A protein has these predicted regions:
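Catalytic-core "active-site belt" of small-molecule-metabolizing enzymes
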Residues: 1-179, 185, 192-234
Length: 234
């Protein structure tokens, strides 16, 4: 499949086509795995099954990649997660975008891999070359907000030093998928929430902030539950 981006290189921008043949979403990617296990137990208390091991990796249908500003979902219990996204052309050429692993939390309690397929993988239409941010990678900041009933709720925030670096993430994916990672999209997994639990709102917004180069990638989309037919979903 082909995705279209604007590649921002220093102060220049140019159109870029990115061909990809597979997409994966990582999870539980904290560099401190003791803290990750605490988070796993919190999720278990909410009814979400514990993974057999961490970090985790899930295959995702390529067609779910989306830059849409509006998504339709089934039911009211879906929410986004801010993540960095690696676009791997080959081992020498990798780009970074910003994404949201939007997930059906009702289905997640039953079947996590299938929960990853039912909602889109949102992504920015702008990307950066990885080599332009690699040296100061840990200083980059992920943030997200949920807009619920007209109120903006600060939802997530954390420096990228908290989760696996691109090199660590690619090494992890290589340990699960044999062969080169050419034409692969990797969603990184996310940072912690500032709220006590999931917030199900009408809009999700996120930023990847580069304080050194004074720039950011920004993502925002509206969430519309299907309402024209009642099928008994929560």
């Amino acid at each position: 499949m082909i995705a279209h981006f604007t590649l921002q290189e220093d102060e220049k921008s140019r159109p870029m086509q990115f061909e990809y043949t597979r997409m994966v979403n990582a999870g539980f990617v904290g560099r401190n795995q003791d803290e990750v296990q605490k988070h796993v137990q919190e999720l278990v208390a909410k009814g979400i099954p514990a993974p057999a091991e961490t970090p985790t990796l899930y295959p995702v249908l390529c067609r779910t990649l989306s830059t849409d500003a509006n998504i339709e979902v089934l039911g009211s219990k879906t929410s986004g997660e801010v993540e960095y996204v690696l676009l791997i052309e080959n081992e020498h050429t990798v780009y970074v975008a910003l994404g949201s692993d939007h997930t059906d939390r009702h289905l997640e309690e039953v079947d996590i891999p299938r929960a990853k397929q039912i909602c889109p993988n949102l992504i920015t239409s702008t990307a950066w070359p990885l080599d332009q941010v690699q040296e100061h990678w840990d200083e980059l900041i992920l943030k997200s907000q949920v807009i619920k009933d007209g109120q903006t709720i600060e939802y997530q925030e954390g420096k990228l030093e908290l989760i696996l670096s691109p090199t660590q993430l690619m090494d992890f994916v290589r340990s699960k998928i044999p062969g080169p990672l050419d034409k692969t999209i990797i969603y990184s997994g996310t940072v912690g929430m500032k709220t006590e639990g999931f917030v199900f709102g009408q809009r999700f917004a996120a930023q990847l902030i580069d304080p050194k180069l004074n720039r950011s990638l920004e993502l925002a989309y509206d969430i519309e539950p299907l309402s024209y037919l009642d099928v008994g979903q929560g």
